[in-house]
Design a protein with these regions (language model features):
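Glycine/proline-rich, positively charged
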Residues: 76-162, 166-170, 180-183, 218
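Short, acidic/turn-prone active-site loops that include or flank metal/cofactor-
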Residues: 48-52, 74-76, 158-165, 187-188, ...
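Structured C-terminal cap/extension of enzyme domains
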Residues: 34-38, 42, 149-155, 169-270
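Alpha-helix-loop-beta-strand connector modules within alpha/beta enzyme cores
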Residues: 55-73, 120-129
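Conserved, mostly hydrophobic/aromatic
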Residues: 10, 22, 44, 70, ...
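N-terminal binding-site loop/beta-alpha segment at the start of enzyme catalytic domains
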Residues: 1-68
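Active-site mouth loops of central-metabolism enzymes
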Residues: 17-30, 72-82, 107, 197-206
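Short, well-ordered coil/turn segments that N-cap beta-strands
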Residues: 15-20, 40-43, 64-69, 97-101, ...
Length: 270
């Protein structure tokens, strides 16, 4: 992967990306999307219900479509048939664009939830040019590693943070052959990495969200880490933090210790 700390090529897509990507799932306001664009962010992940991002990106893409990497897609409903084609067509209408950059199949919890008909349909959409690249989001690290070895998918959206570091052994070593782009999410472990866990010494600090993102970005296997701020102020804090650059060895060691303490609580989190 060709990259510096804030810029990378997203795996075999060949697409240059700013390494902090934006999700608007927590409705931070349209102005946050516009500010992100101004700050150089170009990877945007959206669900179909992200109306703020939909409206903002419609406006941005009128003049900057080729600068934007739009990742969205179909939901894994598990108990019912999912059509990536129908989902793609809905997203094209929503965003008023002729193609998606990354068509995702979202929320794959186990291998059987990525049936062959879904994968075949996604490949066909890529061949047709309606999606430039295809990928999935999953928390199943072993399955993600398998998919990386097989080389069908262009992008893998995975969990990787200071508390959940298993991707370092289960996924990242398998990227070399086919070079899928890696997008990381849940960097704060649903904010648990920002709160003092039971037993953590009272005189010891607690990480900020920015520290959590910098921990993830320090791994060169990661192309993009997603931030999902709740406000423009949070976004400003997060991007200012990552612009500080790579964490020191001491900061990395601290994040691992804190991550171990959070993981040790054995709470169930996606």
């Amino acid at each position: 992967m060709n990259q510096d700390y804030l810029h990378a090529t997203l795996g075999r897509t060949g697409r240059p990306v700013f390494r902090l990507g934006l999700s608007a799932s927590y409705r931070p306001g349209r102005e946050t999307v516009f500010r992100a664009v101004d700050e150089g962010v170009n990877y945007f992940f959206a669900y179909g219900f992200d109306s703020q991002m939909v409206r903002a990106l419609r406006e941005v893409m009128k003049t900057k479509r080729e600068e934007i990497v739009l990742a969205t897609g179909a939901y894994n409903w598990i108990l019912s048939y999912t059509s990536p084609r129908k989902s793609l067509e809905r997203r094209l209408r929503q965003f008023r664009t002729e193609y998606l950059d990354v068509l995702m199949f979202l929320g794959v919890m186990k291998p059987k939830e990525l049936p062959l008909h879904v994968l075949d349909e996604m490949v066909k959409l890529r061949e047709e040019g309606k999606a430039r690249w295809i990928g999935i989001s999953t928390h199943d690290r072993k399955f993600a590693g398998q998919l990386a070895r097989e080389g069908i998918l262009d992008v893998l959206m995975i969990r990787y943070n200071a508390a959940h570091r298993g991707a370092e052994t289960d996924i990242f070593p398998h990227l070399t052959a086919h070079n899928p782009g890696i997008v990381s999410y849940t960097s704060t472990r649903w904010t648990r990495l920002l709160s003092r866990p039971k037993g953590w010494p009272a005189d010891q600090p607690v990480p900020t969200a920015g520290m959590a993102y910098r921990f993830v970005l320090n791994n060169p296997a990661v192309g993009v880490v997603l931030t999902a701020p709740r406000s423009l102020a949070e976004f400003n804090e997060n991007i200012a933090a990552v612009r500080k650059g790579a964490p020191s060895d001491e900061e990395m060691a601290f994040m691992r210790r804190f991550g171990d303490a959070v993981y040790g609580r054995k709470e169930w989190f996606m």
